[in-house]
Curated annotation (Swiss-Prot):
ATP 2 binds at residues 647-654. Residues 316-595, 615-944 form the ABC transporter domain. It comes from the Bacteria. GO terms for cellular component: cytoplasm; excinuclease repair complex. It comes from Mycoplasma pneumoniae (strain ATCC 29342 / M129 / Subtype 1). Coiled coil: none annotated. GO terms for molecular function: ATP binding; ATP hydrolysis activity; DNA binding; excinuclease ABC activity; zinc ion binding. InterPro entries: ABC_transporter-like_ATP-bd, ABC_transporter-like_CS, ATP_grasp_subdomain_1, P-loop_NTPase, UvrA, UvrA_DNA-bd, UvrA_inter. Forms a heterotetramer with UvrB during the search for lesions. The keyword Nucleotide-binding applies. The keyword Ribonucleoprotein does not apply. This is UvrABC system protein A. Keywords: ATP-binding, Cytoplasm, DNA damage, DNA excision, DNA repair, DNA-binding, Excision nuclease, Metal-binding, Nucleotide-binding, Repeat, SOS response, Zinc, Zinc-finger.
Length: 948
């Protein structure tokens, strides 16, 4: 039910001028579902995020103390006259949640915290040796196990009172002394209580009281002392007992949980026991990661058909027979064992290959000569290429070096915990037959089903009722935003931007806040049309709680479902920044000035091609693909066609293309050292001579990187400036106009235009350079003009302005035209690329690749290119893609957008659902052929609605 709008219940924005906004005045209704749309670069994000959200955050920060503000960073006032009626604002964007390998869907949503509580309170410990559920142990049972240790063993019976806690514990030491104890065991060392024990209060410590020291003898007196000691321990620890053996090992017992057959015991169940971030619960070997980075033989020797001389050992391929010390040491191994340098490594004796990788079994003579000519001879074990890589990866302090060695390593599942991250004790606790990690490996759908059907006794129900309810609610929120195919163990760093955003959205629903302004950035990204209705309903629920939703979106269904629609335009960049239309979706559709309205009403649309591309008759066939959830599938991809890979979220599209097909081709065609997901074979690689992956990854990391430098048009522009009369008279070359080398650039900021101020524990702050006023060049360089414009003036131009300016210079105009063709005419040539969205970065890459001559054997791969694109922009992008096909090359696109899908020459639809229920090809063919498969394919069902 849409809430009734009250009088004056608006967010009133007056005079917004942030970025390209042109003094925008607008009243946005509060407690409504409001969508802001418009062409890419028209100013949507400038209004929603850079103005409204930024001001909301700034006001919140100003309400905090100066002490608190220093940890949250500064927030400048946006360029706006006033904003009235602003609520507390929360931004939910598309940034990946976390790059920390410990961060999972479960930890991000805090569901794992509730699970730890549930397993600790109502979980049942089981003996890992198959002796069934563990019952409480009596004092006599524990005493008998200790009594049966080898005769003459010297043991100390300890009462573990402090575990992983910070402090000096002076009061505790005094208390133990008063109770008559003589010794304590602290962090592996025994102290007497009459000496001064100094501990660092900021370090975590383990502390146990030495209750008795006993020599094991098979007599009643010894057994009696053990019983007395155990009873003394229990008074201090509520059941936890430790026995320190002579070799330093510790045996743990618990009066509450212990196996009466084999003596296995587990400490008191507490939430920390199930945390892979706590020393108490994490696997000792992998420290709770579930994996370790180890050298990968397939990456070290990517092509076993090559010999060592031919570069078969990838890390040595550029230093074969050189003077590098690494090669000289390796050559000592070669000479000692007479390893053939010209024999393919795949045909070499396995023992020799093992020694190359793992090192020599014996000390050998290793000869080296330094650059200065100094000779060195040593007898030692050769460490092996694999060990060399691992050691250097651990020892280096250089990020570049670490990335270099990482290229030869892979994540290997931990052998101790088998990837489960926790200790044996933690994993022995079951609920409904599952340990906590096995539960997190269930899909969201199955997890909900499991909890609804779990059988608990009355006591368990009473204790776990609230935690169970909270877990089921939060899992349901994730399901309602279309993420039922995910599992709680999924690493946050592997989530797409859309998935991460919807997880944050689900978390906010769980918080049940009211009176909040939520600002969202394209939440429909990565979502199949089938799941879109659920997402819209979820946002409606948030609105009905009494919140305002301000959503930047291009999806037609979302726009039509909005209470209020704002169209920013009329075009992009300097030609945008105005409110073209605002009102209900119907009112916007009736507004002749609104391009969005024309598309929504059907007056304007992307026309379905009358004929599909015939292709060149060649195909690429992948057999036996079974990575992640793929069900050993075979797929044939026709070449010289536009091929769309579709399917519901989590159906296996990215696994099939990005993790299997692309790495195979990059390895075989581009000769990259990458490892594909499991597959059987690939046929037709000879039809491909180049693979171009147009991803949404950032294209640069420094303020000097910009669109002009990335597409290489800046080289031509610098050459043009260097050929002006003024430049020649001064003796300037094209390097004078570069901000990457000294000479023409500003000497203070080194061509960045900004000065970076390191804030140590806070994010770095960038301030405009005072010397050049952000212009990057020194005054002398800026005096050189071409048609009245300096090099800085050119960098300030949009791509369209620059194209018009340089129209008479073919090599410059051609590159700028490509940027305009992919819908980036609004983009400033000198814009810092770190400010680009993923969609913009992807289109800049496409413009760069399109400069190269078509080979007829190039395969382009794009992943959701519609991200951030208005329907008009999609039309432009499709024109460029059609040009690629006409030039004889091939294009594969992973996409949910129906306007792109309907233009396909061939569709491969995966499903039928996401996660374990996906991974199969359920429909394939032309869009028209898919209409005959609507009973199997969700994509076909939605395609049928727009093709009729």
């Amino acid at each position: 039910m849409k809430p009734e709008l009250k009088t004056n219940d608006f967010i009133r924005v007056k005079g917004a001028r942030e970025n390209n906004l042109k003094n925008v005045n607008i009243d946005i209704p509060k407690n409504q579902f409001v969508v802001i749309t418009g062409l890419s670069g028209s100013g949507k994000s400038s209004l929603a995020f850079n103005t409204i959200y930024a001001e909301g955050r700034r006001r919140y920060l100003e309400s905090l103390s100066s002490y608190a503000r220093q940890f949250l960073g500064n927030s400048d006032k946006p360029d706006v006259d006033s904003i009235e009626g602003l609520s507390p604002a929360i931004s939910i964007d598309q940034k990946t949640t976390s790059h920390n390998p410990r961060s999972t869907v479960g930890t991000v949503t805090e569901i794992y915290d509730y699970l730890r509580l549930l397993w600790a309170r109502i979980g049942i410990p089981f003996c890992p040796n198959g002796h069934g559920a563990i019952q409480t142990q009596t004092v006599n049972q524990i005493a008998n196990q200790i009594f049966n240790l080898p005769v003459k063993s010297r043991i100390q019976i300890l009462a573990p009172t402090i575990k992983n806690q910070r402090g000096t514990f002076a009061n505790e030491f005094a208390k133990y002394q008063q109770l008559g104890f003589l010794r304590v065991w602290v962090d592996g060392q025994v102290y007497t209580l009459d000496e001064e024990i100094k501990l660092d209060k900021n370090t975590k410590h383990n502390l146990s009281v030495v209750v008795d020291r006993i020599v094991i003898n098979q007599d009643k007196q010894t057994l009696g002392r053990i019983v007395d000691a155990i009873e003394g321990v229990i008074k201090l620890t509520e059941g936890r007992i430790e026995v320190l053996l002579e070799d330093g090992k510790i045996l743990s017992f618990n009066k509450n949980h212990g196996c009466d057959q084999c003596g296995f015991s587990i400490s008191e169940l507490e939430p920390r026991l199930f945390s892979f971030n706590s020393p108490l619960g994490s696997c000792e070997y992998c420290k709770g990661l579930g994996f370790s980075y180890e050298p990968d033989v397939e990456k070290i020797i990517p092509n076993p058909l090559l010999s060592i001389n031919e570069g078969g050992i990838d890390i040595f391929k550029n230093i074969v027979h050189g003077t590098s010390l690494d090669w000289q040491r390796f050559l000592s191994l070669i000479n000692h064992y007479q390893i053939p340098l010209d024999q393919p490594l795949g045909q070499m004796d396995t023992d020799l290959v093992r020694m190359i990788l793992e090192g020599s079994d014996e000390p050998i003579e290793i000869k080296t000569v330094s650059n200065s000519g100094a000779k060195n001879v040593r007898f030692e074990h050769y460490e092996g290429v694999a060990h060399l890589i691992k050691r250097r990866h651990l020892e280096t302090s250089s990020q570049a070096s670490r990335e270099w060695y990482s290229a030869y390593m892979s994540e290997i599942t931990c052998k101790k915990c088998q990837g489960k991250k926790l200790t044996t004790n933690s994993l022995s606790v079951k609920l409904g037959g599952l340990d906590i990690i096995s539960f997190t490996e269930l899909s969201i759908d199955k997890a909900i089903e499991f909890l609804l059907q779990i059988e608990l006794n009355q006591e368990q129900k009473k204790i776990g009722e609230l935690a169970l309810k909270e877990i089921i609610n939060r899992l349901s929120f994730l399901k309602n935003v279309g993420l039922e195919y995910l599992n709680l163990a999924r690493r946050a760093s592997t989530l797409s931007g859309g998935e991460a955003q919807r997880i944050r959205l689900a978390t906010q629903i769980g918080s049940q806040l009211t009176g909040v302004l939520y600002v969202l950035d394209e939440p429909s990204i990565g979502l199949h049309q089938k799941d879109n209705d659920r997402l819209i309903n979820t946002m409606m629920v948030m609105r009905d709680l009494g919140n305002t939703l301000l959503v930047v979106e291009h999806d037609s269904e979302t726009m039509l479902a909005a209470d209020y629609l704002i169209d920013i335009g009329p075009k992009a960049g300097n030609q945008g920044g105005e409110v073209v239309a605002a009102g209900t979706p119907l009112e916007v559709m009736e507004n002749p000035d609104s391009l969005t309205g024309q598309y929504l009403s059907g007056k304007k649309q992307i026309e379905v091609p009358k004929t599909r591309h015939a292709g060149n008759g060649r195909t690429l066939t992948l057999k036996g693909a079974k990575g992640n959830n793929l069900k050993n599938i075979n797929v044939t991809i026709p070449l010289n066609k536009l091929v769309l890979v579709t399917g519901v979220s989590g159906s296996g599209k990215s696994t099939l293309i990005n993790q299997t097909l692309v790495p195979i081709l990059e390895r075989l065609v581009n000769y990259k050292n990458v490892k594909p997901a499991p597959y059987k074979e690939i046929i037709g690689v000879n039809h491909i001579d180049k693979v171009v992956v147009v991803s949404q990854d950032p294209i640069g990391r420094t303020p000097r990187s910009n669109p002009a430098t990335y597409v290489s048009v800046f080289d031509d522009i610098r050459e043009l400036f260097a050929n002006t009369k003024e430049a020649k008279a001064r003796g300037y070359t094209n390097s004078r106009f570069s901000f990457n080398v000294a000479g023409g650039r500003c000497d203070k900021c080194f061509g960045d235009g900004v000065i970076r101020i390191e804030m140590h524990f806070l994010p770095d702050v960038y301030v405009t350079c005072e010397m050049c006023d952000g212009k990057k060049y020194n005054p002398q360089t800026l005096e050189v003009k071409y048609l009245g414009k300096s090099i800085f003036d050119v960098l300030q131009m949009s791509c369209q302005e620059a194209y018009d300016f340089f129209k008479a210079i073919p090599n410059i105009a051609r590159k700028l035209k490509l940027l305009c063709d992919v819908g980036l005419e609004y983009l400033q040539l000198g814009l810092n690329v770190t400010f680009l969205s993923g969609g913009e970065a992807q289109r800049i890459k496409l413009a760069k690749f399109l400069q190269k001559k078509a080979t007829g054997k190039t395969l382009y791969v794009l992943d959701e290119p519609s991200t951030g694109l208005h329907i008009e922009d999609i039309n432009k992008l499709l024109t460029v893609i059609q040009r690629i096909i006409k030039n004889g090359d091939s294009v594969i696109i992973i996409e949910h957008n129906l306007d792109i899908i309907k233009m396909a020459d061939y569709i491969i639809d995966l499903g039928p659902e996401g996660g374990e229920k996906g991974g199969q090809i359920i429909a394939q063919g032309t869009p028209e052929q898919l209409l005959n498969q609507v009973d199997k394919s969700y994509t076909a069902q939605y395609l049928a609605k727009i093709l009729k």
